[in-house]
Amino acid sequence: MKKNNILILTALAALSFTSCGNKTNGVETDTDSLTADTTVTAAPVADIHTEEAIKDQITAYYNELNNVNDGGLDMTTLDSIACTKSLLALMEQVEEKSMKAIAQGNDEYFEDEGYRWYQGLGTPIKVQFDDITDPEQDRVEAFLTLSWNGQKGQVRLRLTVEDGQWKIDDFADYDTDGVGFRRDMESFLGINLDNPAG
């Protein structure tokens, strides 16, 4: 993926802590867009299979990401909160292989930082929700337009219900036709994408 496109994906690591309503710590939001610049306190949601619950979860992640520089959660903790267990395991394998390659002076390491890389941690990110597919299912795609520091980009965030909340399972640009961060990592690890067993 291009670094520009990764900017958009990077901010997504911070998506966990469920919240309810259209107010986040005194910051007014509407159902279509918000500026994520404060921490959202976790609150139970009666039914997570609603568009509102999905938006609240995504909003909470962005709030946490924006607070990293202000003494909030560190990125490792954020990853563990925001991502599915299978994505975390894949990220760990990629990091291990990359560290070995770097230690051996090999330049074939994984450079894509995914959702964690964007211009200026702590910079408020404006999130516009463009679409959420089938919120009544356990797997959804959320189409977002992100903007910060005068930049804009579109991202497709794939979420799965795990441990009672929506977690990031993959992320990609709008126009990648299904190819995302997960597939890039699998390719780097040499996993046969047509036949995962071989």
What is each stretch, according to the model?
Residues M1-L7:
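Bacterial N-terminal signal peptides that target proteins for export
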Residues S16-S19:
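C-terminal motif of bacterial Sec signal peptides marking the signal peptidase cleavage site
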Residues G21-P44:
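Short, low-complexity, disordered segments immediately C-terminal to signal peptides
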Residues D47-D70:
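Short, aromatic-enriched amphipathic alpha-helices that serve as compact interaction elements
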Residues N63-K100:
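Short, solvent-exposed secondary-structure junction/capping segments
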Residues S86-Q151:
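Surface-exposed, charged secondary-structure patches
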Residues F129, V155-V161:
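Hydrophobic/aromatic beta-strand elements that line small-molecule binding cavities or substrate pockets
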Residues P135-R139, F143, S147-Q154, D170-G198:
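Low-complexity, intrinsically disordered terminal/linker segments enriched in charged
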